[in-house]
């Protein structure tokens, strides 16, 4: 390995160590990280913990809408399926959609923001006007429209959320890009013959990535809430179990009017808990990467 590569690797390792040391000082962030770790492990181990049969209607072992008991700690749904098992399986889809949708949203926003901030001129103005249009339009409404006109499925939900929630990231990244472009070493890079691609990849992107990381963490929380809303409205994938889909099934089963609280509470609390955990992590990351926020 060459000396420059070794030096760059050592710097990245030292930066990661400094980040973790600063992150550990945020108790709320640690609490959110611990909660997300447990939920992610449970979701990954769903086949081992509850098995595949829990999703089957024909092989349900309980009676319809049984209250919590020793056999069914969270009760059963209208088909007699164990709600605890469904909750565990639902975590997989809710987390997957949240992660993928947030990644797509941040990728689009970062691309638009870096290009607009670097090039400027009429092209940047046009990009920002498109961004402003998306900003003034309610994200949920646009996502509902896309999910309605496209075929129903997990990837449809991911795309519907990702392509409608990127404008905030684009605005933030553009502002950061303009700030980076004003620094002296950018002028030196241009004087030495650095092209647009070199400057954006070697100088701009590394400096905006901390902001992108914080925005991604916060975006996952919003994406999970949007996915739950779409599933609750019947626009999710009917072939998989998700927390939002469980809420929709509870509504269709009349759990609200009949007082079957155990059908509504688990998925609702799970959505709130995961959204809160990602928000706590995002705020902690934001505070570490931008110490001025922590002083407020």
Residue ranges with predicted function:
Residues 31-35, 97-101, 127-130, 143, ...:
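Hydrophobic core positions of alpha-helical segments in small-molecule transporters
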Residues 92-108, 197-229, 278:
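Transmembrane alpha-helices
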Residues 135, 146-149, 176-177, 219, ...:
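Glycine-rich helix-loop "coupling/hinge" segments at transmembrane-helix boundaries
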Residues 166, 170, 223, 274-278:
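Alpha-helical transmembrane segments
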Residues 1-110, 114-115, 122-125, 140, ...:
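Gly/Trp-centered helix-boundary motif
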Residues 73-77, 83, 104-109, 114-180, ...:
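Generic hydrophobic transmembrane alpha-helix motif, especially the helices
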Residues 46-54, 117-121, 146-152, 226, ...:
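Short helix-capping/hinge motifs at transmembrane helix termini and TM-loop junctions
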């Amino acid at each position: 390995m060459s000396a420059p590569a070794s030096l760059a690797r050592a710097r990245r390792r030292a930066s990661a160590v400094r980040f973790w040391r600063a992150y550990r000082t945020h108790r709320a962030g640690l609490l959110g990280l611990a909660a997300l770790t447990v939920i992610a492990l449970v979701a990954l181990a769903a086949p081992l913990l509850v098995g595949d049969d829990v999703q089957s209607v024909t092989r349900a072992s309980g009676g319809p809408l049984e209250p919590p008991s020793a056999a069914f700690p969270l009760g059963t749904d209208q088909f007699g399926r164990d709600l605890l098992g469904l909750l565990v399986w639902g975590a997989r889809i809710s987390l997957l959609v949240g992660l993928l949708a947030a990644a797509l949203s941040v990728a689009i926003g970062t691309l638009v923001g870096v290009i607009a901030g670097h090039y400027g001129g009429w092209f940047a103005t046009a990009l920002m006007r498109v961004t402003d249009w998306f900003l003034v339009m309610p994200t949920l409404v646009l996502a509902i429209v896309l999910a309605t006109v496209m075929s129903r499925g997990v990837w449809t939900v991911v795309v519907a959320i990702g392509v409608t929630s990127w404008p905030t990231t684009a605005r933030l990244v553009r502002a950061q890009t303009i700030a980076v472009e004003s620094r002296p070493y950018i002028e030196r890079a241009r004087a030495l013959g650095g092209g647009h691609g070199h400057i954006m990849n070697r100088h701009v992107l590394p400096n905006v990535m901390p902001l992108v990381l914080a925005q991604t963490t916060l975006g996952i929380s919003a994406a999970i809430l949007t996915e739950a809303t779409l599933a609750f409205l019947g626009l999710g994938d009917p072939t998989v179990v998700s927390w939002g889909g469980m809420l929709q099934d509870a509504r269709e089963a009349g759990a609200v009017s009949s007082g079957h609280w155990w059908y509504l509470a688990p998925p609702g609390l799970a959505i709130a808990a995961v959204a809160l955990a990602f928000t706590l992590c995002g705020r902690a990351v934001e505070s570490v990467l931008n110490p001025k926020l922590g002083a407020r």
